[in-house]
């Protein structure tokens, strides 16, 4: 099992990532639609490239310091309130954060800007309170903060 490269355990009522530490060769981890409330136990998974955490009860993005190979981070439909602790994920190309509780979109560049994430291509933020409160300004605001992206939510970004 220690040579396992992909683990897909969706819809299993998982409440913690206990026991996953020996799987150091994991590249893809999908734990969607479970009962996680906290991100922990990923420290030894330094080869991880794709992490799918959607539809859990995660409240905070944290404990990803050792997962610097991540190219995809999906934490849609959780209870995350702020985008933080991701600046070091410089290889990230896909950042899916839609349908959370993120109210403030004013500092996206401080966490996801091109100086930190030059490969960031796709960002999903729709369905957050911040998107709703920005109204018609939402798309433009995100594009100005993240000029490197080619897709915002399900729509391609026009380059001016």
Question: Each predicted region: which residue ranges?
Answer:
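Conserved hydrophobic beta-strand positions in leucine-rich repeat
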Residues: 4-9, 26-31, 48-53, 71-75, ...
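Extracellular beta-strand scaffolds
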Residues: 14-15, 36-37, 58-59, 80-81, ...
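Membrane-proximal C-terminal cap and juxtamembrane stalk of leucine-rich repeat ectodomains
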Residues: 122, 127-160
């Amino acid at each position: 099992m220690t040579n396992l490269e992909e683990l897909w355990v969706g819809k299993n009522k998982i409440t913690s990532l206990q026991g996953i530490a020996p799987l150091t060769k994991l590249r893809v981890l999908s734990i969607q639609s479970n009962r996680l409330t906290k991100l922990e136990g990923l420290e030894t998974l330094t080869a991880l490239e794709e992490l799918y955490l959607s539809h859990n009860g995660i409240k905070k993005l944290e404990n990803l310091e050792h997962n610097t190979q991540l190219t995809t981070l999906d934490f849609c439909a959780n209870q995350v309130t702020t985008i933080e602790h991701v600046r070091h994920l410089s290889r990230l190309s896909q950042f899916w954060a839609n349908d959370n509780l993120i109210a403030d979109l004013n500092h996206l560049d401080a966490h996801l800007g091109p100086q930190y994430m030059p490969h960031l291509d796709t960002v999903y933020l729709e369905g957050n309170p911040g998107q709703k409160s920005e109204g018609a300004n939402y798309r433009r605001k995100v594009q100005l903060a993240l000029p490197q992206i080619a897709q915002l939510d399900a729509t391609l970004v026009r380059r001016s």
